[in-house]
Structure formats: structure tokens, C-alpha cells
Regions:
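Glycosyltransferase-associated regions of secretory-pathway enzymes
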Residues: 1-171, 187-381
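Small-residue hinge/turn detector
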Residues: 173-184
Length: 381
């Protein structure tokens, strides 16, 4: 059931999706098409005929997830159902070798897809193809839907969320929050999955590995509970990372990542941000004062909420939980291998940042490489 949330009556669904004849995303997923298997076409038709009203946002729940449960009427009910279904712990609801649920989250300001650039529509189409084929849940969160989610699942965070001056910062914060509360896979709308998320973790990825400098061996037998890719992979001694604008020699992506619900590393990110915002609030008598807003506007989003903030949280958590030497994660000396640290899987740069050019390549292989999983069109944010 894909739901196009709207305050309008169900009949308006045809108006909302009157774009099907011109937009391949809806052509492929809302009517039979010779370009996709008949089995997928039949499922897609069923999806698009099942419509419920809601205030915001769009979602899809596999039929097998709702067979024994009341049909969700709102995005919040759908998220609660996703939590309920995956809490049962059936293996088919999770990525292999992990406790990460097969739930995809994406964000965008609105669902007027006729105004979206072609590349965004094509990216979402690819995500939806894998979602339907592998019986995954899918959520597209609009701006209003993000506020609704925060107010329902994390009401104590409303002031922090609303104080962030830029929408990109709110989106950064939301992706971590929704992964914390629901779990799943996050992908920016301008990311294209090159492989289905159900195939992202292989038995090769969770094998033991050795820190080549300290000779420490990491041989965790735990299921993966968080998964991140590398955005920057530089030798800490040659200052390449600084020349390219990266404060960390090993910096993680946050245009795509995956996590089990309620994972401590994500809590570390949230606590770091809350501490920084509370410090500003204490200094200026609240977060809504003009002085507080001025200070917040002067902060770099990449540092406050973006990949630098994610990297900092991961570095702190993995140092505490596993004593990790951060630069041991480099793939420059082993051809780019995945590394499991405790229950966090760090994928090489090619996985989420393949196809980089000669400058700033950092070991990135072509998008055709078997380890390439996601292609980010906004690469280098």
C-alpha cells in the first residue's frame, strides 16, 4: 500500500497522480509496464489502488507487513506499524548479517513530483523498484511530516529542531532521529542505489580484520547494528583532507547510512547536538533570541549537523566501545575493504562514493565495481 497523504478526499488521488503518463516513476509503479516483470507490475497496481488519507507524506508497506494488522491511516501509524513488525525479529525483515530493518527513509520538501528534476524522479524510481522487489517498507518525509514525526516520537526535541536556522540542518537532524526511533536505511533523494539494500552486507564484509599499525585484531561476531560509508579517505600525514575541505582524514557519509532502532552511536550524535544547542541557549537566554539565532546562523551546517557531526559521533562511540584507532579504517592500504568494529560496519569509499575523478579519488573505484552500492549525485557536500 503506497499512501499519498493528503487532506483531500480519496478521489483526489487521480489528480495527485495525473502525471503518470509523463513520469516514469509513476508509470512503472502505478500501471503495468512492459519494462518491468509482470509480477512486479501486478504488485505495483495493487499498491497504487490502495489509498488512505493523511495530513502529510507518502509511504509504502509491503502487503505481508499489514496482513495481520490494521491498515495505517497516517504516516505516524505507518511508522508505528513498521516498528511493531520489525520488533518481532523475523530474519526476512532485516538486512543480512544485521539487525537493521528493511525500511527506507527519504526526505524532500514536497511531493509535487511534476516539479522535481528528472534525476530525482529516476533516483526515487530505483529505490522504489528495490523496495517492492524485496518487500521493504518506504517512507518519503516532507517538511511538515518531519515536524509531525519529531512532535510524536521525540517531543522534547521540538525546540532544538525548530531552532536550527537552515532546512538542511533540520533534515540532517531528522535523518538521525528517524533512524533512531524507527531504524532502517536512509538515502538522500539524489542518491541512486546501485544494488538492493538487502544485498549491501555480505559475509566478506563481516570477516575479521587487523589494524596494520597496532596489530589489533577485530573479530566481532555480533550482528551489524549500524552501517556507514566513507566520504573521505586520506593519509593523516599528507594534509590532503584539509586541502579538500575535510576536517577528518577518515570522514563518513551521511547521504546514506543504515542503523538498527535505538542505536547508541546515533544517540551520541543527538546528545552532541543537544549539548551544543543548550550551551547557546544558556549563553543567550534561549534559542529563539536574536543573539542565539545569529550565533546559530554563523555555524557551518557540515560541522553542526552534517557529515562532520556524524563522523565525530562515530569516532567518539567506537573509541569508547571498541578502543578503535580511527585511522585504522582507511582503505588505502588494503584495496578498500569493509571493517566491522564491534557492531558497526564501515564500508570503503567505493561503497557510497564510487566513481570519483582523478583529483580527490582517495581509492574510489568506478560505479561498476562490485563494492559500489550507492551513487550520490551531489557528491562532495
Amino acid at each position: 500500500m503506497r499512501t499519498f497523504a493528503s487532506t483531500a478526499p480519496k478521489d483526489s488521488f487521480i489528480n495527485v497522480l495525473n502525471l503518470r503518463s509523463s513520469l516514469s516513476i509513476w508509470k512503472n509503479f502505478c500501471q503495468p509496464s512492459e519494462n518491468i516483470p509482470k509480477e512486479l507490475s501486478r504488485v505495483s497496481v495493487k499498491i497504487c489502488r490502495t489509498v488512505f488519507t493523511s495530513e502529510v507524506v507518502v509511504w509504502y508497506m509491503p502487503p505481508s507487513w499489514v496482513q495481520r494488522n490494521p491498515q495505517p491511516r497516517t504516516i505516524i501509524e505507518a511508522a508505528q506499524l513498521a516498528i511493531q513488525v520489525t520488533d518481532i525479529g523475523e530474519v526476512r525483515h532485516f538486512m543480512p548479517h544485521s539487525q537493521i530493518p528493511l525500511i527506507v527513509h527519504q526526505t524532500w520538501s514536497h511531493r509535487q513530483i511534476d516539479t522535481w528534476p528528472d534525476d530525482l524522479r529516476q533516483s526515487v524510481e530505483k529505490w522504489l523498484q528495490f523496495v517492492v522487489e524485496d518487500e521493504m517498507a518506504y517512507f518519503l518525509w516532507e517538511d511538515e511530516g518531519m515536524v509531525e514525526f519529531i512532535d510524536h516520537f521525540e517531543p522534547q526535541a521540538h525546540d532544538y529542531y525548530s531552532s536550527l536556522p537552515l532546512m538542511v540542518e533540520k533534515t540532517d537532524y531528522f535523518r538521525i532521529t528517524v533512524a533512531t526511533c524507527v531504524g532502517g536505511i536512509y538515502g538522500d533523494l539524489d542518491t541512486v542505489p546501485l544494488k538492493p539494500p538487502a544485498q549491501w552486507i555480505t559475509s566478506q564484509d563481516v570477516r575479521p580484520w587487523t589494524d596494520l599499525e597496532t596489530r589489533s585484531v577485530y573479530n566481532s561476531m555480533k550482528p551489524v547494528r549500524a552501517l556507514f560509508g566513507i566520504e573521505a579517505d586520506c593519509l593523516p600525514t599528507d594534509h590532503t583532507c584539509w586541502r579538500m575541505g575535510y576536517p577528518y582524514s577518515i570522514q563518513l557519509t551521511q547521504w546514506s547510512f543504515a542503523s538498527a532502532r535505538d542505536y547508541p552511536l546515533l544517540h551520541q550524535y543527538i546528545e552532541n547536538l543537544a549539548h551544543q544547542l543548550q550551551k547557546i541557549a544558556n549563553h543567550h537566554g534561549g534559542l529563539q533570541t536574536s543573539a542565539a539565532r545569529t550565533e546559530l546562523q554563523a555555524l557551518d551546517p557540515l560541522t553542526l549537523t552534517g557529515p562532520e557531526a556524524v563522523t565525530r559521533a562515530a569516532q567518539e562511540w567506537l573509541n569508547t566501545s571498541a578502543g578503535l584507532r580511527w585511522n585504522a579504517l582507511t582503505g588505502l592500504h588494503d584495496g578498500g575493504k569493509a571493517k566491522l568494529v564491534d557492531d558497526v560496519l564501515i564500508l570503503p569509499i567505493t561503497s557510497f562514493s564510487p566513481g570519483r575523478g582523478k583529483y580527490g579519488n582517495m581509492g574510489s573505484k568506478p560505479i561498476t565495481d562490485p563494492t559500489a552500492l550507492v551513487h550520490h549525485h551531489g557528491q562532495g557536500s
